[in-house]
């Protein structure tokens, strides 16, 4: 009796599906390209030259995911914007140090490859790369039977940028008297989603039918993370930016001290900006205390920028020109070593 001849497909890995996906995404990848990119998809490694305008270039790298926002995206079958979130979480961390993102790579892992879903996700990644001005130069699609539940997938992103060595922003120039400028967020971005999902569970709502501020809750909670690269690079060009804080996991309490010298503190007026409606809903439905809100969520603020008071008017005008909502939310003050680095009052 002859034995059955087994194939990789019999084991759950469909190489043809992977090849189909590559063909599907080529046009999306192409629209992200930069002049520095050498070659196209299909190589073992991606090649990229440094932009010639840099005299003493320093590479800046970052990697991130989208946390359990992905669980909601999968459950609500909304796959076309989660890739924007993935890019945003990486490139926003790079621009904090003054870096221009150059190229991006993604990792997409699943138990059984659904070409349509994967193509939607990668289209979103390409959209994010276009917004950030970086090239999608490659990635890995891993089909791993037995590793994920049916329909589930996971994402990771990797980005490299470049900054002139003399123009690195590291917070060392922050001084008492600097103004704190806040850039509005589009919602929770990609942080706090385990708590969001718990509040949804406790409240018993249906995200697809519940309305919140003239939009469905699902639209609000899955709104893609804002990509601040282009407006922030313009601010850096036209004002004297001393520090930039990307409000991610840990919120205000954890992230702001990362960009401040030990001799100062950030004093923030919580009445100076608008909370996005979803945060008010979360606080009410989850009975979440004030400290926890500021520790878990961005509460309507995606980035905070420290700069001299004399540059505030220029910065606000520039941001208005490019359609970014911004507020002056506080200032930098002297602090003793044992004082809290963030005061919200």
UniProtKB/Swiss-Prot annotation:
Its EC number is 6.3.3.1. Pathway: Purine metabolism; IMP biosynthesis via de novo pathway; 5-amino-1-(5-phospho-D-ribosyl)imidazole from N(2)-formyl-N(1)-(5-phospho-D-ribosyl)glycinamide: step 2/2. The keyword Ligase applies. It catalyses: 2-formamido-N(1)-(5-O-phospho-beta-D-ribosyl)acetamidine + ATP = 5-amino-1-(5-phospho-beta-D-ribosyl)imidazole + ADP + phosphate + H(+). It holds the Pfam family AIRS. Its main location: cytoplasm. InterPro entries: PurM-like_C_dom, PurM-like_C_sf, PurM-like_N, PurM-like_N_sf, PurM_cligase. It is found in: Cytoplasm. GO terms for cellular component: cytosol. GO terms for molecular function: ATP binding; phosphoribosylamine-glycine ligase activity; phosphoribosylformylglycinamidine cyclo-ligase activity. GO terms for biological process: 'de novo' IMP biosynthetic process; adenine biosynthetic process. The keyword Hydrolase does not apply. Belongs to the AIR synthase family. PANTHER family: TRIFUNCTIONAL PURINE BIOSYNTHETIC PROTEIN ADENOSINE-3, TRIFUNCTIONAL PURINE BIOSYNTHETIC PROTEIN ADENOSINE-3-RELATED. This is Phosphoribosylformylglycinamidine cyclo-ligase. It comes from Histophilus somni (strain 129Pt). The gene is purM.
């Amino acid at each position: 009796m002859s034995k059955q001849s087994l194939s990789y497909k019999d084991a759950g890995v469909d190489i043809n599906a992977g090849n189909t996906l590559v063909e599907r995404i080529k046009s999306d990848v192409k629209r992200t390209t930069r002049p520095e990119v050498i070659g196209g998809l299909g190589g073992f490694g991606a090649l990229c030259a440094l932009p010639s305008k840099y005299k003493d270039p320093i590479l800046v790298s970052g990697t991130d995911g989208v946390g359990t926002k992905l669980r909601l995206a999968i459950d609500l079958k909304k796959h076309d914007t989660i890739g924007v979130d993935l890019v945003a979480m990486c490139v926003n961390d790079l621009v904090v140090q003054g870096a221009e993102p150059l190229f991006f790579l993604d990792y997409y892992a699943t138990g059984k490859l659904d070409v349509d879903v994967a193509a939607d996700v990668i289209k979103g990644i390409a959209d994010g790369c276009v917004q950030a001005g970086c090239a999608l130069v490659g990635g890995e699609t891993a089909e791993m039977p037995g590793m994920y539940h049916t329909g589930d997938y996971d994402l990771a992103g990797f980005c490299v940028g470049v900054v002139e060595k003399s123009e690195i922003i590291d917070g060392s120039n922050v001084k008492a008297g600097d103004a704190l400028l806040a850039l509005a967020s589009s919602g929770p971005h990609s942080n706090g989603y385990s708590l969001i999902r718990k509040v949804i569970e406790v409240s018993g709502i249906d995200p697809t039918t519940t309305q919140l501020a003239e939009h469905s809750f699902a639209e609000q909670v899955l709104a893609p993370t804002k990509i601040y690269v282009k407006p922030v690079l313009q601010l850096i060009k036209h004002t004297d930016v001393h520090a930039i804080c990307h409000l991610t996991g840990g919120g205000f309490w954890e992230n702001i001290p990362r960009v401040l010298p030990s001799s100062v503190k950030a004093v923030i007026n919580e009445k100076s900006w608008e909370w996005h409606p979803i945060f008010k809903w979360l606080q009410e439905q989850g009975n979440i205390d004030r400290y926890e809100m500021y520790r878990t969520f961005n509460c309507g603020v995606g980035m905070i920028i420290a700069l001299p008071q004399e540059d505030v008017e220029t910065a606000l005008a520039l941001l208005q020109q490019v359609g970014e909502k911004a507020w002056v939310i506080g200032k930098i003050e002297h602090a003793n070593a044992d004082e809290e680095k963030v005061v919200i009052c």
